[in-house]
Amino acid sequence: MAPNIRKSHPLLKMINNSLIDLPTPSNISAWWNFGSLLAMCLATQILTGLLLAMHYTADTTLAFSSVAHTCRNVQYGWLIRNLHANGASFFFICIFLHIGRGLYYGSYLYKETWNTGVVLLLTLMATAFVGYVLPWGQMSFWGATVITNLFSAIPYIGQTLVEWAWGGFSVDNPTLTRFFALHFLLPFMIAGITITHLMFLHESGSNNPLGISSNSDKIPFHPYYSLKDILGLTLMLTPLLTLALFSPNLLGDPENFTPANPLVTPPHIKPEWYFLFAYAILRSIPNKLGGVLALAASVLILLLIPFLHKSKQRTMTFRPLSQTLFWLLVANLLVLTWVGSQPVEHPFIIIGQMASFSYFTILLILFPMTSTLENKMLNH
């Protein structure tokens, strides 16, 4: 029999084992589509970002004008920018749904895969943050000032750390230059960590909605899931293109159409929608260091999830009580997102504090308690 180059060539063999002949559970649902969608998001963002970087100038006097120039004078520059800006939103939608899937179906029990995923989330958040500063509008400047200033809450080294990050005594030209360098570098780091993430996943194989071993019923990734992923891609591209072409500024802040001015503070400083849940948790604590710790905990709590798993069943498919709690957590995050966009006044302050408290309570206390209760119910 003639050798198959797809299975014998050192490079093609790796691609074949990851994307073509990969044994995959036969019953994974559409919730398993988001991994490939995230890969497509990353590819799109790197491509559009590269094209934008060719026309961008990382200088405080020219940054705002260079972005305007890209949109006005570069062939399809407006489209590239709109796809890049709104592509970030879709990246976060996909990663939130991907994490939600992992929580619901107990995928976090693959600890290495889960931990590399958390690292990916943190890197993505860092990339989005430094990227938002680059157009050098009002919200870019003040967002950068407020968020970087939080590091000054770190005892003893805080102030030195902030001035080191800024490259001066305030957010200025050196800050913009280094943020551009970081925004260029981080997506390639994300791509590298993604390969690690995939490598760990392929050590164990995919989880499935039943949470039981699927070794007895595997199907090849291609053509079944390759086709399913292409369908998922078209279903994601449709709303992305609709948003980028019909209302590209829907998710942006109007304040960012004004060039950065250190002498005028915007009435409401708030980040992009995908950071609002964490921003609400930060604001709900009246102490600076406490707020920073809560902000960090709101994301790093994901690292604790595998250790808080007390159920005898892996997934929530047959656990109605945990399901109820899960959807309560989703609703809670939506409330946090909404509160984060509101001004700091009554009743939003107390709503934010209650939502922040319940966020940590659900994850740290109620989930393990409910799992233990469900285990007991199984015995009767």
From Swiss-Prot:
GO terms for cellular component: mitochondrial inner membrane; respiratory chain complex III. GO terms for molecular function: metal ion binding; ubiquinol-cytochrome-c reductase activity. A ubiquinone binds at H202. Pfam families: Cytochrom_B_C, Cytochrome_B. It is found in: Mitochondrion inner membrane. One of its GO terms (biological process) is mitochondrial electron transport, ubiquinol to cytochrome c. Belongs to the cytochrome b family. The cytochrome bc1 complex contains 11 subunits: 3 respiratory subunits (MT-CYB, CYC1 and UQCRFS1), 2 core proteins (UQCRC1 and UQCRC2) and 6 low-molecular weight proteins (UQCRH/QCR6, UQCRB/QCR7, UQCRQ/QCR8, UQCR10/QCR9, UQCR11/QCR10 and a cleavage product of UQCRFS1). This cytochrome bc1 complex then forms a dimer. This is Cytochrome b. It comes from Tragopan satyra.
